[in-house]
């Protein structure tokens, strides 16, 4: 029992800074929306429309680079720290390649926005302007993630937390300058949010670069030691590990976007109630997601040490801690669901709808915790292809169709509206959680040599 308690402490020490970093990142989006909304409703809507395209694109790049964390953790655990710098340099090349791809997508985003039904031309113009501004921050954001993944792979999660919080503080005055046109800058409105966010990402990258070159714990990792040409073998291996994670993230984000579109014809009350429940669930999701990052680090590190048994301890402890936290947040959601809904909106019908959906959101949190932490454990084992197949099957082949049947048709029960989609979410996430656990159990039953060889690859 003692080894599980010790492991739980290590996991929480890694996870808490990740939670704070994620909150800072989310708060940046909230600040953008509020400050754009103070100019006009059109500017706020433009930022919202732009963000709906920006998020899937940038999360694809983010997911691709997550392959670095278990790679660095495994090299660190196995005492091969001298090889870390080369992996990270290739991470920069990979980030540069995917940056060009994402920037091309964002540059041509006007074609996507113009296809939206009855979109106001002024809103469309501002949304495109926002995307054309924020796209210059793509390399800065992904370069920052490369160095953040290096630090997290070395079990250093606090730098990401501190720099993320500083980024939030810097974002507010830069937003003010470019939104309202202060200190000689043009008044860009919602487009100014894109300029500010792009600028902040470069500031965050430079701060992280400054940290890794001066941190005593990383003095032996010489990133600046001469020019490193692309190593296509390493980049191919990192891409092979990262691409399934990137696609899984992309499919998850687009799933929620599709559900939002399917709910939209059901009326303002249904849409508002759904959005409140989803927004609050997203906040609660940060807890298991941070444990997922910690699980990747601990499992990767233990496998690097050659300790398959300790990797199992890390995997089971992360799951247990995640379920415990999810149980607490689920009870909190059930007890305070009406009070939470009132924070978002005071309309009685909307509060009633949101309160009803939050009962389902409470159940959703338990399955969500297991599946996202399971994903982190599998990343630690470098078994990322299974993550893609499990999430695609669970979300798109089970969750969405069952949600559609329950929410909008009378085939099974009378159409349930948004509640049907939330039951679909629960079905999909529960399936994902079960499949993740089964996959982890299968992996752990393999011969030790197979597990260690796979992790070292």
UniProtKB/Swiss-Prot annotation:
Keyword Transmembrane: yes
Keyword Acetylation listed: no
Cell compartments where the protein resides: Cell inner membrane
GO terms of molecular function: antiporter activity; xenobiotic transmembrane transporter activity
Cross-referenced InterPro entries: MATE_fam, MATE_MdtK, MdtK-like, Multidrug-R_MdtK
Any one biological process term the GO annotation gives: xenobiotic transmembrane transport
Membrane topology qualifier: Multi-pass membrane protein
Transmembrane segments: 11-31, 46-66, 93-113, 127-147, 160-180, 188-208, 243-263, 283-301, 316-336, 357-377, 387-407, 418-438
Keyword entries, A-Z: Antiport, Cell inner membrane, Cell membrane, Ion transport, Membrane, Sodium, Sodium transport, Transmembrane, Transmembrane helix, Transport
One Gene Ontology CC term in the entry: plasma membrane
Family recorded in the similarity comment: Belongs to the multi antimicrobial extrusion (MATE) (TC 2.A.66.1) family. MdtK subfamily.
Function: Multidrug efflux pump that functions probably as a Na(+)/drug antiporter.
HAMAP family per UniProt: MdtK
Protein name, entry field: Multidrug resistance protein MdtK
Source taxonomy: Bacteria, Pseudomonadati, Pseudomonadota, Gammaproteobacteria, Enterobacterales
Primary gene name: mdtK
